[in-house]
Amino acid sequence: MYLSLFLVIGSFCLLKGAINKSSIFKSYLISFLFFLNTFLLSVYFFMHFLSGDGINDAIIFHLKFGIKGFGIDEYIIPFSALVLINILIFSFFKLFIKNLTSNSTFLNLNKFFPILIFLLSIFSNPFYKDTFMLMNFNSANHNIDENFFYEQEIFFNKEKKNIIFIYLEQIERTYLNEEIFPNLMPNIKKLEEQSISFTNIDSPRATNWTIAGMAASQCGVPLLTPIASENSMSGVDKFLPLANCIGDILNQENYELQYIGGSDLDFAGKGNFYKTHGFNLVEGWYELENTLKDKNYRSPWGVYDDELLDIVFKRVQNLHSQNKNFGLFTLTLDTHHPDGYISQSCSNNQYKNGDNPILNSVHCVDELVGKFMDKFLVSEMYENTTLVLLSDHLALKNSASHILNKQKRKNLFMIFDKSAKSKSIDAVGNTFDIGPTVMSFIGLNSNGLGLGRNLIINKSLSVENNLDDLIMSNKRKILDLWSFPKIKNGFRISEKDMKIFFGNRFIDFPALIILDIKNEVDQIMFDFYYANPLSNKVKRLKDKSNFLWIDQCSKIYEYKNLNKFHQINDYCILLEDNKSLRFEVMLLDSKNINNEYIKNYFSHE
């Protein structure tokens, strides 16, 4: 990354000094390529600041799925810096072009060294490498026929227990290393002695952000979306509806399932995930706001952890009093990167000299979790309840990354069960293995779930398999878990709701619906905040698939080169039959467009 920056600066100086009389076209071309390369490098630096790992699955997912509910305050300065840098880049580009005249242009091609440095600056740009690796991973065709999915029935063969999941935002096992972080998490360190602690839990691909970690640990699958086909999933009504998750299994057994989170449920689709998978009550910031003592006591992400854990403990007491099996899942927030936040109740308890903000936050949350667990473990609720303390994912780039990145990093995973003997288990495992392992403690015969395995009785698939290859071998099956709605179940467009209804399913529009050979839904594409117009996606369709496109009339007319009058807010539907080389454009309210109309249109010979 820094090598590329050095080469960019060096190539600018050398190219600037290598000007000679030559082709004005070549001058423009080399100038454009140079400044494009510089622009993409600046974008990479910003993405790296967000993720700590360059352009990865988490960055792509949030660009695709959406960022509503995003705690944006801590990113204002770096984002402003990105904008300023690119304004300067654009200004330099304009000035550079302005000075290129027919009498003073391009570099002397005999001066090989400037060209070499310039090419090296392009080839070393990590933006291209990360993007290529992601696209290659998502589009590669692996000829592996083995099905690693565990799909046998999971049922109770022992007495049912309640279950509590406490996801600790970006708190990983590495923070427990006393040689590196002495006395950083003394409470959780002490609690570990009373738990079944798994010390060797890795993060496979597509699991290292919050909703991905939740899907992996509860469903045993990575959070893949059809990125190669630019499918955002942001407008789909159900989140991995065909995945079999802990919530689905417990819901069938009449468990009362609840999720309490301090942030906006819309962020990354967390609320949709829990509602899809059997949870009766799903609450985030807006649902909890009116129950808070002080509505102004919140971080940029939502409810502070001291307030959240107090709400969770009271909810556990309430659920326990109802004499019905329950599952309660929650996620803390204070340790969110890059610097974390400090709850008022432990604001005076800084770590060491207090100069590292994220470590202060981790130290504070350790205190809050310790207080919660001290109350829970001596209560009657613990008699028939299994509690899980775990990472949602490894820490992203924060004020301690320079220390964390030098270590062998693992996820936190501890199970507290009064009927089980405390011990430490160093078996190789990954986030997929968490779900089936936990379920075995609450009475289920869970040998596996998805790509996960019960680490108490089985070896993780990580032991004998390359996980990237394993995920790719099951990619089609994983993508099918999104289960697009079917036209045969009905088709109705509501302009008022900006939705397309397929029976009891729906998607948002604008949308591009690509059909398969049976003229059923194969893919659905959306326009994420108008960042990539659907017209571009239509143009890039490589096959002769039929499709429906619902969008503003102006965009459809422009694509089809139609000169028609329309109101600025009018929406149209384009039906394009690429096999018969014909199309039809209609205002949404011009005809009764239903599933029969679509079926008849595309069945026309």
Residue ranges and their predicted role:
Residues 341-347, 359-382, 410-413:
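Active-site neighborhood of glycoside hydrolase catalytic domains
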Residues 212-223, 403-446:
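Substrate-binding rim/cap in mid-to-C-terminal beta-strand-loop elements of soluble/periplasmic
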Residues 1-134, 601-605:
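Transmembrane and membrane-interface helices of multi-pass
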Residues 12, 17-20, 265-268, 420-605:
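Membrane-interface soluble catalytic domains
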Residues 215-218, 275, 331-338, 388-398, ...:
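Acidic helix/loop microenvironments that form the catalytic cleft of cell-wall polysaccharide enzymes
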Residues 51-61, 85-86, 90, 114, ...:
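Active-site-proximal alpha/beta segments of enzymes that process anionic O-linked groups
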Residues 248, 310, 363, 367-371, ...:
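Feature representing long, continuous alpha-helical segments
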Residues 364-403, 438-445:
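Metal-dependent active-site segment of extracytoplasmic phospho-/sulfohydrolases and closely related
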